[in-house]
């Protein structure tokens, strides 16, 4: 790609008005965005079929003639790619556009949370797309075009993708909005606290980016004076979180309504920034948390998934048999890539209709009362992967349900929200759920009754998982979790240098 194209794209970013862009997105019919995503899919396929050695070979082995793929319906007949049948079968170089490293502006790594780490070269144009997506979200939620802002990136962990992309994007946002600055203490509690103590007072607001367990730990340790005097906004990514978690964080930072204070970005190493929460999606999730009927109507089950909106210029997402399949532009393009994540798609019209049917009110009227202006970009929801959960007597227990149990007021003063769980068997082959919990800083293992904690955690877990609640009422103490306690920062389970692994 010519340098001129990068300069033009950057000029477009710096001269754009995200508030006007968001207003246009609220007026444009949703079909415009779906059509745009389909066009992205076809364009990305054509580039890959012509220039990516691995994908050419993949099509040949699957007896697929790329010349016959002309419409989106043709596109949907293409074989799915995956880590096993595509990424792991070819050298990294052969997976790249042109089969070479030309114009690959940065390379980062996955966290290895689902296996060995992989490396992801990307074009600078991908990052510019992230800049635009974050700009739209930051203006919608945080009014960064009107307030001086300090960006605190506490997600940096060396070569891993999320922290790297956020760090670069935050710096470009600070370049665009002049009365802003960016600092990157990384996933380091002391450095983050020192940064806030030294700098926060000079800005109208502070946006802190990080992983949910770190952010929860941070707000628990935040000095009351900083929490009281600072307008804190939170961006969480890297893993899903519940509305109970959002409400807990809101309470700790003094926010009554979290629609415009706490949001998440949904991303992955292979897909980059997939989507963002806007105020509308936060509101919908907050209502769904209190209405099982709405949750089931929207998502087909009573578990509340992540819900974001995605930009159609860089990706196309499909629901194939209840799993998300993604086509993504980039230095390492992916065509109909099976993410292995359970989830689905919704249009704004779908959501408004089901909201009216279940809640009995007009969604836009309710949003207007909260000062929220919706946009019409497509929604994607994500439950996560079954292999990221533990099983107990035939039911599935997700990390999100355990996280909710651990932030209960009854035990929160003893525990952080970090844990590791697994299904274990005793000598008689009885199945048990084992949860290794991290104690708060300064709390000693011998000062806490693990058995009492097990009882409280099981009661809280029953509140968030109806299946576990039924199991507990039937089997009583036989399904109480086995609780193992570790001191704060235990190197085996809770190293601050790595992304938390919830499944052992």
Describe each region flagged by the PLM.
Residues 1-109, 114-148, 202, 429-504:
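Nucleotide 5′-phosphate-binding alpha/beta core
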Residues 2-23, 81-300:
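Active-site phosphate/ATP/adenylate-binding loop shared across adenylate-forming ligases
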Residues 41-42, 302-306, 390-393:
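Active-site rim elements
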Residues 52, 211-212, 399:
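Helix N-cap/beta->alpha junction signal
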Residues 72, 181-190, 416-424:
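Long, charged, glycine-rich C-terminal linkers/tails
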Residues 154, 211, 237, 277-279, ...:
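Structured loops at beta-to-helix junctions and adjacent beta-edge loops in soluble globular domains
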Residues 208, 325, 330, 335-472, ...:
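AMP-binding/adenylate-forming catalytic core of the ANL superfamily
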Residues 247-363:
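Conserved AMP-binding/adenylate-forming
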